[in-house]
Amino acid sequence: MKSAHMVAGYELRPSASWRIMTEAYYQKHYNIPIGPANTTTPFLLHNSQINEISGFVNDSLTSDGKGRSYGLELTIEKSLTNGIYLMSTTSIYQSKYTGRDGIERDSRFNGRFVQNILAGKEWKVGKNKTSIFAANIKLLAAGGNRTTPIDLEKSRTAGKTVYDWSKSYSEQLPHYFRTDARLSFTKNKKRTTSTISLDIQNVSNRLNAFDRYYELKKDKITLITQTGLLPILNYRLEF
C-alpha cells in the first residue's frame, strides 16, 4: 500500500505559554490489496486490506484497491507554567476505501471525530520545594469504529457469525469515551529520584464497544466490550 499526502497548517502563539495550531490534510491511498478481478466471494468483493486489524487475509489478493482520508485538526496547547499545563486536540475526518466492486465505502476506522484533552497541575512541596506532587487527567472521546451488519438468519443456519459483506462497514458501533486519572509524588534527592503513582484507567468504568458477533447459545447478536476501570499502582526508583 502506498499513500500521497497533502497538508496545510497554521500556527498562532498568542503568548509565550499558549499555542494554537490548525491543520487540514488529504491522503490518497493506492496499491491497496483487494480481492482478485474474478472473485465472487463477498468478503473479497466488497472489502479491502485497509480495514484489517488482525493481520493479512489468507487469500489471493491484488494491489488494485484505493482509498482516501481527509480532515481538519485543531490543537490548543498551554505549556507548563505556574504548575499548570493543558492540551486539547480536536479532529474531524473522513476515511473511505474502494474495493473490487468499485463502490466507495466508509472504512472500518471512519469514526469521523476524535477529541483528546490532557490537563495537569504540579505542586512543589517539601522543605526545599524539591519534591513534586502532581495530578493529571486525560479524556478521550471518539466516534465508534464501523462494522459490517450480521446476517442473523444465515448465522443461525451456519451456527456461527455470518456477515452481510454487501453492506460492508455500513453500521457504526457506539461512540468511545474514556477518562484516565493519575496522582503522583516525586521525591528528588541528591543521588536518587523516587516516584510513587496511582493511575486509574477508565475512571467512569465505561464498557466501550469493540465488536459484535452471533452468540449461538443465546441465539442473538452480542456486543463485545473493552476493559472497564483499572487501577495501577507504580513505584519507580532512579539512580
Model-based region annotation:
Residues L86, K138-K160, P174-D180, F185-F239:
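C-terminal beta-signal and adjacent terminal beta-strands/loops
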Residues S3-A4, P42, I53-L61, G99-G102, ...:
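Extracytoplasmic loops and strand-loop junctions of Gram-negative outer membrane beta-barrel proteins
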Residues V7-E11, E23, S63, E73-T75, ...:
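Outer-membrane beta-barrel architecture
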